Amino acid sequence: DIDTLVDMVQQRLANHQPQPSLLHGDLWSGNCALGPDGPYIFDPACYWGDRECDLAMLPMHPEQPPQIYDGYQSVSPLPSGFLDRQPIYQLYTLLNRAILFGGQHLVTAAQQALDDVLMEKMR
């Protein structure tokens, strides 16, 4: 039921009032590189939103080095509750991929994310 999902998300995000940030929008290892002058990111799908959205995508691509989180935390620490909000921010991408690309693994991942949000399995 979409109304139940929307209510759950609203409840979970009610006390989270992040400052809007310019987001990459498609952050994963295929859009990052390390060059002679340092790291580069490219192929953005930029928008303004919660900075946690970009970081929530990283676990969906396990090839990302864990140092990304360490570096991010050293510059701009994440507020408490990030891991609780992560499935909410992953849900859009998973549903979008399931619709666009199909495949049982994507449909299963999208269903698991929905279950995590609806069943309050969040950390």
Curated annotation (Swiss-Prot):
EC numbers: 2.7.1.-
Membrane-spanning ranges: none
Enzyme class: transferase
GO molecular function annotation: kinase activity
Keywords on record: Kinase, Transferase
Pfam families from the UniProt entry: Fructosamin_kin
Gene3D superfamilies named among the record's database cross-references: 3.90.1200.10
Residues at the active site: D26
UniProt key word Transferase: yes
Family: Belongs to the fructosamine kinase family.
Functional description taken from the UniProt entry: Ketoamine kinase that phosphorylates ketoamines on the third carbon of the sugar moiety to generate ketoamine 3-phosphate.
Protein name: Probable ketoamine kinase in tonB 3'region
Species assigned in the record: Klebsiella pneumoniae
Lineage: Bacteria, Pseudomonadati, Pseudomonadota, Gammaproteobacteria, Enterobacterales
